[in-house]
Swiss-Prot record:
Residue span, Ubiquitin-like domain: 1-76
One Gene Ontology term from the biological process aspect of the record: translation
Additional remarks: Ubiquitin is encoded by 16 different genes. Ubiquitin is generally synthesized as a polyubiquitin precursor with tandem head to tail repeats. Often, there are one to three additional amino acids after the last repeat, removed in the mature protein. Alternatively, ubiquitin extension protein is synthesized as a single copy of ubiquitin fused to a ribosomal protein (either eL40 or eS31) or to a ubiquitin-related protein (either RUB1 or RUB2). Following translation, extension protein is cleaved from ubiquitin.
Family from the record: In the N-terminal section; belongs to the ubiquitin family.
Superkingdom of the source species: Eukaryota
Gene Ontology molecular-function annotations: mRNA binding; structural constituent of ribosome
Name of the protein in question: Ubiquitin-ribosomal protein eL40y fusion protein
InterPro entries xrefs: Ribosomal_eL40_dom (IPR001975), Ribosomal_eL40_sf (IPR038587), Ribosomal_zn-bd (IPR011332), Ubiquitin-like_dom (IPR000626), Ubiquitin-like_domsf (IPR029071), Ubiquitin_CS (IPR019954), Ubiquitin_dom (IPR019956), Ubiquitin_ubiquitin-like (IPR050158)
A Pfam family it matches: ubiquitin
Gene transcribed to yield this protein: RPL40B
Amino acid sequence: MQIFVKTLTGKTITLEVESSDTIDNVKAKIQDKEGIPPDQQRLIFAGKQLEDGRTLADYNIQKESTLHLVLRLRGGIIEPSLMMLARKYNQDKMICRKCYARLHPRAVNCRKKKCGHSNQLRPKKKIK
């Protein structure tokens, strides 16, 4: 039978499957067509996320049904060089003593009107 898989970009993929096929098999077919690894795929049908070990028949997926493909978001650790860059970007600032505006490291006067473009600046305190 034929089913459709719709991605978040609006692209529709057509797959040839059997009702006895597992969700794992469907994800493998999507990988063959689109190159998306199965561990990054989440399939949704009738508002439910489909579990890998179950079959299409378990979810009452019939011919010409449409599944929705969502990519799994993975959290993780930031690379050390990017961490240093982010820390440098966020900590190398000057602070206005009157209005507490964050300014670039070589600032001489504040850019805000509310403090009268004060020249009373201090370096931002470093995080321990």
